[in-house]
């Protein structure tokens, strides 16, 4: 198998986080989820310590509770910033609007994955 470094560089330099275009109806298989966690495990850690634990949440009630906490802690700020920047062309306008959208719809995502670090 060949490795295309140009394509890798292109992907790493053009791929941004996706918040507004999430497919909230699409299920995430266990296989895909585990593949994503496996890839994320390759990220460096301080002192090369493996101190991460992954919490996978599919339960709608738990997702709703987490979403409510998330909105309680920062949702109002995101909403206010989104309204303040709307139509200004500010370089953070799209990011804040997308973050505000995600905060409003967080419990609708098929699965939440929280990474914890201990030590």
What are these regions (language model features)?
Residues 1-35, 42, 49-50:
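Specificity-determining recognition surfaces
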Residues 8-10, 53, 109-111:
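A generic secondary-structure signal marking the coil-to-beta-strand transition
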Residues 15, 40-43, 69-73:
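Alpha-helix boundary/capping residues
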Residues 25, 29, 35, 45, ...:
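General N-terminal targeting signals
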Residues 38-44, 53, 100-101:
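Short secondary-structure capping/turn segments at boundaries of alpha-helices and beta-strands
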Residues 47-58:
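Short loop-to-beta-strand entry elements in the cores of soluble alpha/beta enzymes
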Residues 56-119:
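Glycine/small-residue-rich phosphate/adenosyl-binding loop
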């Amino acid at each position: 198998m060949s490795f295309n470094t140009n394509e890798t560089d292109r992907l790493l330099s053009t791929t941004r986080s996706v918040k507004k275009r999430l497919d909230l109806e699409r299920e995430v298989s266990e296989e895909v989820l585990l593949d994503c966690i496996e890839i994320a495990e390759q990220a460096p850690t301080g002192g090369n310590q493996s101190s991460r634990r992954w919490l996978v949440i599919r339960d709608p009630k738990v997702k709703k509770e987490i979403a409510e906490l998330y909105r309680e802690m920062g949702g109002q700020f995101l909403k206010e910033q989104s309204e303040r920047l709307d139509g200004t062309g500010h370089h953070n306008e799209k990011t804040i609007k997308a973050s505000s959208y995600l905060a409003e719809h967080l419990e609708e995502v098929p699965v939440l994955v929280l990474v914890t670090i201990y030590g």
